[in-house]
């Protein structure tokens, strides 16, 4: 009954070991420019500006892709993603990274096809350079005070819930680490789960606002830990659904 489970992964420092934006600009020797511009631009616009500088410096799309393929993704996470997909779980990514970075890394590790949806900032190639645009454009602001202007993950969870079939109940597992993962956590129901990373902002915000969180909380502190917890959780939820289904049929 794993087909009744929807798993939403944050990307940076959750599904992958590091932050994809920082991974690229540090390896392209743009850390100082990042520091200079950080106070003046929102993150999404800053990343687009750094990509412009990479293009000026002669870095190609292939150079960026090669850099991304060096991003660590723990084998245990690759394994649990494949396992969850094989069991029928609906896997999605909700991230403030971008389509190009996420697709390149997931394809490199052979798990891109395991995900039904990648919800993130769009990326396009324009005259030989990579451009990043906000998921929520300025023409239609999301109005959420908890999230950056370009992406509200809480709204994404709401959209996922609306898209689910009313004829079959689904349970959500949300996995994240950052402060922008708190808003989607608040959209989860009592039968759902949130998996925050230990010693990161999401867990801190949950701890300070536990009365607002309806979902069950399961902490993790490493990729191996996450894979074990997620695997066991899928098994337990599947067994619960089987028992519930059998009881209903009696």
Question: Which residue stretches match the model-derived regions?
Answer:
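C-terminal cap/substrate-recognition subdomain and adjoining C-terminal extension
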Residues: 76-82, 86-90, 97-250
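Alpha-helical substrate-recognition element adjacent to the catalytic core
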Residues: 2-122, 126
């Amino acid at each position: 009954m794993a087909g009744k489970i929807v798993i939403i992964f944050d990307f940076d420092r959750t599904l992958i070991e590091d932050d994809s934006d920082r991974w690229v600009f540090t390896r392209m020797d743009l850390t100082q420019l990042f520091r200079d511009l950080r106070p003046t631009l929102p993150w999404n616009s800053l990343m687009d500006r750094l990509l412009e500088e990479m293009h000026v410096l002669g870095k190609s799309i292939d150079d960026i892709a090669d850099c991304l393929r060096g991003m660590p993704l723990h084998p245990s996470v690759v394994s649990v993603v494949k396992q969850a997909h094989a069991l029928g779980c609906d896997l999605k990514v909700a991230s403030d990274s971008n389509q190009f970075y996420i697709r390149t890394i997931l394809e490199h590790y052979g798990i891109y096809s395991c995900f039904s949806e990648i919800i993130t900032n769009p990326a396009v190639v324009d005259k030989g350079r990579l451009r990043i645009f906000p998921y929520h454009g300025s023409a239609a602001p999301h109005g959420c005070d908890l999230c950056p202007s370009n992406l509200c993950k809480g709204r994404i969870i709401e959209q996922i819930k609306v898209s689910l079939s009313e004829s079959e109940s689904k349970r959500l597992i949300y996995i994240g680490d950052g402060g922008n993962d708190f808003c989607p956590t608040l959209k989860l129901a009592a039968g759902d789960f949130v998996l925050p990373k230990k010693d990161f902002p999401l867990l801190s915000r949950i701890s300070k606002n536990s009365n607002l969180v309806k979902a069950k909380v399961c902490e993790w502190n490493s990729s191996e830990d996450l894979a074990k917890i997620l695997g066991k959780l899928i098994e337990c939820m599947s067994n619960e659904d089987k028992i519930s289904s059998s009881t209903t049929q009696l």
